[in-house]
Amino acid sequence: MTIKKRLFFFYKEENEELAARKISKQIDLPFCGLWRTDLFKEDKFKNHYGFIYSASRSYVLPIEKKRTNPILCKFPSHTKISRSTNLLKSMKGVSKEASILDATGGFGKDAFEIASRYNSIKIVEKVPWVHYLLKEGIRDLSQESGVLSGLQLELLDSTELLANESFDVIYLDPMFDTKLKKSESKKDIQLLKECLPDQQDNNLLLVALESARNRVIVKRHPKLDYLLGKKPNFSITSKLIRYDIYKT
């Protein structure tokens, strides 16, 4: 497994150093001091990424001369989510009280969409720094009115969880596919692809199929083959996304 770009840990405000050092150890990123906008001039950091800790909200930025918007976990208002998205269509027939697992949490966008229409969903994310950003996003969400209380987050490898628990629905987004062009990926997805090892969670599909009581939903790009070559019971496809539904 190879990592294409590195992620360095910085802190935003001078009075946050002690807290920042603690967090950098907690999420296993190399502590590199106070964030500066000219870090792109240093070969060590140039064209990599900076995780910038802030007590109010942490985020990630590419370390480059060009200024870009921060990458963070931010959820839209759940009232803006259509009831007829393809993801929600893939859940048709599932009870609102069903137990649901997002086994590949990432930045939580899909889990949030599911939680907008279902009573609860457990999100599992195994990468500490991704989990930290997602935790902050859920924290800020809980402070808003009309809170979605059904989001549960754990720092854990989902295969370990599924060794002991089963769910009605298990959702998988194996986004580590290198066949797609960079331009087809959003900034947050590109960050994950570039800063995490190449890995195919093929075994996770097999575990999920054994553990799901109702269905497994796999998110794919329409150009990609079925995961493990396993044909689903049916698929729901748009221009950029295909949901493969495996009834269990």
Regions found by a protein language model. Give the residues of each.
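Conserved beta-strand/loop positions that form the S-adenosyl-L-methionine
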Residues: 103
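Mobile active-site "lid"/loop adjacent to the S-adenosyl-L-methionine
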Residues: 174-204
